[in-house]
Each structure stands twice: as C-alpha cells, then as structure tokens.
Amino acid sequence: ELLPDKANEILKALGPAGIVDSLALALEALDQPLHRWELAARVTDATTDPFRKVPGLIGIDASITANEEGATAWIDTKDFELVLPSVYREPIRLTSVLGTLEGRWQRDALFLEHGVLLGSATEHDAAVQFEIDIPFSKQSSVPLEMRLAASVVDAPVGIREAYVPYRMPAPAYAWLQQALPVGQIESGVFLWHGGFKPYGHSSQTMQLAADLSGVTLDYQPGWPAARLTESQLRLDDTRIDAWSAQGQLAELSLVDTAVGLHVGSDAIWLNLQTQSNGKPGEIVSALEQLPALSKAYPVMRDLTVGGDDPTTTTANVRFDLRNVGPSLDVDVDVALTNATVASALLDLQAASLSGDLRYRTLTGFESTGVTARVFDRQVAVDIGPQLATAPDTLLAAQFDFEAAVSDVLSWRGVSYPLPAEGVAAVTVGLNVASEVAVDIESDLKGVSVDLPLPWGKSVEARAPLKVSWRDREWAAWEVFWFGRASAITDTPEAG
C-alpha cells in the first residue's frame, strides 16, 4: 500500500517469489515511510518473471542493502537462469553466479547498473558486465535499453547458442547453427547494446568476436567441409565473418581463407575466398568435390592432372542463401608450373603445362600465357569464350603446335606404313557445350605424300586437311581433305 499504483502494477506483473531469510527496515518517519528509509535483507531462490521484454530472473541468492536513492545486491547463487524470451528461445543457464549489481530509480524508470558478475555454465565460464534501463510505461522519458558484455575463454563453439539471438534472419541463424559443428573458443566476447526492437534496428547493436581453434567449417550442406587450424570469428547486426591463415579442404591445404555472410533486406550473400599452393592433382581433386563447379565436371573429369611443382590457386564462391542455384557465382584462378595433363577424350597427354587458367560461372574457362609440350613439341594454348562455336559453351580452346606424321600415327595407334612423312603446323579446336566438338586442321605444308595426283603432294605444297569429331554414336571421325578426298570413319575407341 505504500507504493504508487503503477509500481504495484509492475510488481504484480513481475510475480516475485522466493524466500526472505532476514530483513531489517529502518524508517525516519512513519507518516512518510518512503521519504528516508534503509533496508537490509538476505534472500534465497528469488525469482521474477519477464515483463515487457525485461529479463526474468530465476534462482537468485543475494544479500541486499537499499535506501531511497538505490540498492546494491551481492549475489552468490547456484543454478541461476536469465530469461530473455524476446532474444533467446531458451534461458541462459548458469550453474553459479558471483558478483554485484546496483539499482536506482526515478519516478518513471528503474536502472539496474554496474553489474559485474562471474558465471559458470556446464561447458564454460564467463565474466559478465550487465546494465538495463527499465521504463515503467511507454510514456516514460527513458527507453528500454540493455548493455550486456560477456567474455569467455576455453569453451566449445556450441555455447554460441547461449549468446546469438534467434531473432537474426532465419537463413542466417540456421547457417550459423550448422556452419560450426566442431571447434574450440580460445577467447571470445559478446556485446549487446540497445533495446529489443526488430533485429538490425539502428538503435541497437549485437556483436560477437572470438579466436577459434580446431574448427570444422560446414559452410554449405552437401559441400566438403573445411578444417581450420586457427581462425577468427566476427558477428554483428548485418555480417558474419570468419578468417583463417591455414586450413584444409578434402586433401588440399588452404591459406588465407575468408568466409563472409552479409545479411541484407532481400538477400543473404555468402562469400567464400581461399588460396592454395598444393600440387595440380590435389587442386583438381578438391575442385571436383565442390557442387559449385558441377557445370565444369565434364571437363575436370576428362582430365588427369599431375605434377610436383606447387600450383597457386585462388577461389571465390558467392551465392544467396535464399536462392542458391540462380545466384551462384564462382571464380577460380590457377597458376600452373610444369604440370602434366592427360585427356581421355583426346587420348593425348601434354607435359610442361604452364600458365594461368581461369574459370568463371558466366564465361567458362579462360587462359593467359599457357604453353605445354605435346609429342615433345611446344604447344601454344588459347582458352576463352571468344573461341566458342556453340551456345552455352563451357570450354572453348585452341591448340597450335607442329606435329610429325610419325607422331600422329603413334597417337592413333596406326602400325602399318603410310606414304607420308614430314612435320606440319596443326591447329586443334575443342568446344565443350551440350555436345563436344573436336576439329583438327592443317594445311600439311612440310609433309610430303607419295601418292599419284590428286592425292600426292610435295613438302612445300599446301593441301588443307580437316578432321572433326563429335560426341555422337555414329561417325566418330569425319575427314575432309579439300580437293582430294572425304571420309567418315567409326572408331569407338577414339571417344
């Protein structure tokens, strides 16, 4: 009856419960009991319910002193729970809490401040600073605002569920829950400053930063997880970022890996960047396991890549979590040095492959300064969309080199002698789209053919020849020797 009606209304809503072990109250004047007074009490298992987004408190054991200006609580309790239903689905449960919390009030608000607490949970300990401003009504001059900071050391990454608000956009919250199934927090800090408005509101901020070790980064279901030796995690209202100097994907060692999640109003973009200096075969093996590169599988699975020299590779994968397929954007850059590559399609192997290869989702494969050796002869390689001969081309390439007749016969496994010898310039065009096309062209200058006219020719004479292959069940090879002959041959082993 001594309190104002509004205070009584709030007190009733809070539903305080517990045991008052001892109480001492001193009043200066009985006719003005709230003017000057002092109180000392000891409470056990004190509990209050959540009220208008104000946290609920369960299981407080504390000694309290108070007067008309404010109060101080010395807390030493077991099995404590902090209930914040507008932020966390489950209460924050602590097996013990030790610390102090001060309070003061004015006509239209209560201020809990200078809270310094040491808490222990099942899997971690935390040092906590806590303050909250609680208005008594919507018309109060004081907005609802909480200031919470918690630091932890040596804890499993699973404790993030105790700190990361479920009010994050659902895809981002779900990603964070599944992205870090394994790992250890070496040290971390969590901050909340502001009220409890919709997530990302400009009047409030939530931030988390941690040093992690032994992390498994399951960044996308169905993709190979990355294992990060040491990493840093940062999370705020619109971004989740992780960095690692060293890691591993499949059997491939990674360096300078960065994963970023940007939460926008209409999209949630995941961006993965990494580098590697692995061997060529390790690079291709790892890339083959990425669903993001499924469009490139026909090319990668045709090739057997080897070599012992380090291959510098950078990869950038970007997509919208809300719409992965149409938004997927992949960039891969590979700097090859003295690699070997064998094509099952062409039944051909190249050595000393060096230069820069690129793959882009929109344009397919490209190259810069790529050279190799075929038949122990230098080959110039050009790869890029400008060479495409069909829509939706994945890879369009041109190979220019010199070949001896004996090399070609050996390549095709022809054991019987032919009336031709010499060396000629050859251009091979390869186009991989919904169908695969191979065109081999030469003017045969440098090759002599010891046959009667019109088939015979001298070394210096030009006699354009084109041999084409298409991935269809009939007519594997089509031969056009312009002005001399044409043929269709079926050689299944060629394809």
Cite the ranges covered by each PLM segment.
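Transmembrane beta-barrel architecture of outer membranes
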Residues: S22, L57-D61, L94-L98, D125-Q129, ...
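Extended amphipathic, helix-rich lipid-handling scaffolds
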Residues: E1-F51, I64, G70, W74-T122, ...
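Short beta-alpha junctions and helix-cap segments that line functional grooves
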Residues: V87, H114-V116, Q129-F130, T229, ...
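C-terminal, active-site-flanking charged/polar segments
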Residues: D133-P135, Q232-I240, A250-I268, G355-Y359, ...
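Extended, hydrophobic alpha-helical segments in both membrane/secreted and soluble proteins
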Residues: I60, I64, L112, A126-F130, ...
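Short solvent-exposed loop/turn micro-motifs enriched in small/polar/acidic residues
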Residues: L57, L94-S96, L110, P224-R227, ...
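Hydrophobic residues on conserved beta-strands that form the core of alpha/beta folds
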Residues: V20-S22, L112-H114, D125-A127, S187, ...
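Solvent-exposed loop/turn segments connecting transmembrane beta-strands
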Residues: R52-V54, S120-D125, P221-W223, A250-S253, ...
